Amino acid sequence: MVSSTTPSSGEYLLEMSGINKSFPGVKALDNVNLKVRPHSIHALMGENGAGKSTLLKCLFGIYKKDSGTILFQGKEIDFHSAKEALENGISMVHQELNLVLQRSVMDNMWLGRYPTKGMFVDQDKMYRETKAIFDELDIDIDPRARVGTLSVSQMQMIEIAKAFSYNAKIVIMDEPTSSLTEKEVNHLFTIIRKLKERGCGIVYISHKMEEIFQLCDEVTVLRDGQWIATEPLAGLTMDKIIAMMVGRSLNQRFPDKENKPGEVILEVRNLTSLRQPSIRDVSFDLHKGEILGIAGLVGAKRTDIVETLFGIREKSAGTITLHGKKINNHNANEAINHGFALVTEERRSTGIYAYLDIGFNSLISNIRNYKNKVGLLDNSRMKSDTQWVIDSMRVKTPGHRTQIGSLSGGNQQKVIIGRWLLTQPEILMLDEPTRGIDVGAKFEIYQLIAELAKKGKGIIIISSEMPELLGITDRILVMSNGLVSGIVDTKTTTQNEILRLASLHL
């Protein structure tokens, strides 16, 4: 299926037309188009697995396209590497930043193309040119600072400045705001608009609809490897884009709430982490069947709460009471034995073993329970439980031997949640559970969470997405600079109240 709306003729910086790419048994791209104008910000949207990454890999020469044409500034191109693309004016700022943490900012800016004076690197010239670019983009970073000492948002600014230094005409940004505060997002948007004013074409990839409508001029939607539409944002609604992405209308963004919170199962009093700055005097209750959200700005120490409960961080004071009995989780194993489970924020770095199969990733948190009387692993039980994870979590995969890194983000997250459910937890803690997941898969994750709450699990969710917290939780605990600034009832609170509480102790 394709839309009747096609990009109108006109001057384009980048024209990708009729791009096809197949892998054994799979047609990854089927006659896909992407056309980007100068002085524009162009959203590239689609569910995970829609073909966005494959299309861009064809542009950068990582994959060789089967057919189709790519024109850049009116000339046909066929790059063989990302380096060649960059040298010719096409740059990409990746979600996983590609910087050398041990080197200085200006080293990273000019790596592989240092200005020289005789036989030596011209440090003064490198500093001056880096500073000039930073000044033009309103970036307040010391060019001599070591990259490893900077925040994620500052690192992203460096990546954008690097693209600027190559005089890039096309800049592709992949989920650039996933780890940024609202203030940092606004600064990033200012820089993106500066690039637009200078004549750049920006390709902006994000699952955050609010950002797309705030920033972009046009949108191209892909689905199942096909081009669906390219349209101006001004004539679209959020529901229309979602319908194009998923192939159907999503009548609601969040499932109906059918859980009924019961008695208190977890009492946390004056919890303080040993290594400061961290959480201080955190107190709250969690009820059976309740979904408790944790809100706060970046740096509020939200993650420190669940890490301290799970034994990753050592507590210096406070009590944790489970079913009326005081417990101490000195490490993750003790936490698991007490019925806690933690789905971590950084899925790819701490949640999955990307190059191993679904079976391994499903069972690793519970692996010792599969040993038989002679100490060998019970393969039939392992296979059965892996299949349970696939079926009950509705994981889309050819089979349990599939490498988990090849799955979409949503399906990876389902496997991780299923893995923890095999440990039979009473308390499931999820840190940014839908980060980097497309809108259709988000709804499926919300459904799973709602079903678990309905079955009586106590659930704690940390999220930076306010609509998510307001859409699925029963109560929201708001953190500010390591302190609890309030606990609000989701039904009666507002986004403004939560933001006010989040700023209380800054």
Curated annotation (Swiss-Prot):
ATP binds at residues 46-53. Keywords: ATP-binding, Cell inner membrane, Cell membrane, Membrane, Nucleotide-binding, Repeat, Sugar transport, Translocase, Transport. The lineage of its organism: Bacteria, Pseudomonadati, Pseudomonadota, Gammaproteobacteria, Enterobacterales. It catalyses: D-galactose(out) + ATP + H2O = D-galactose(in) + ADP + phosphate + H(+); methyl beta-D-galactoside(out) + ATP + H2O = methyl beta-D-galactoside(in) + ADP + phosphate + H(+). Part of the ABC transporter complex MglABC involved in galactose/methyl galactoside import. Responsible for energy coupling to the transport system. InterPro entries: AAA+_ATPase, ABC_carbohydrate_import_ATPase, ABC_transporter-like_ATP-bd, ABC_transporter-like_CS, P-loop_NTPase. The keyword Translocase applies. This is Galactose/methyl galactoside import ATP-binding protein MglA. Its main location: membrane. It is a peripheral membrane protein. The complex is composed of one ATP-binding protein (MglA), two transmembrane proteins (MglC) and a solute-binding protein (MglB). The keyword Protease does not apply. Belongs to the ABC transporter superfamily. Galactose/methyl galactoside importer (TC 3.A.1.2.3) family.
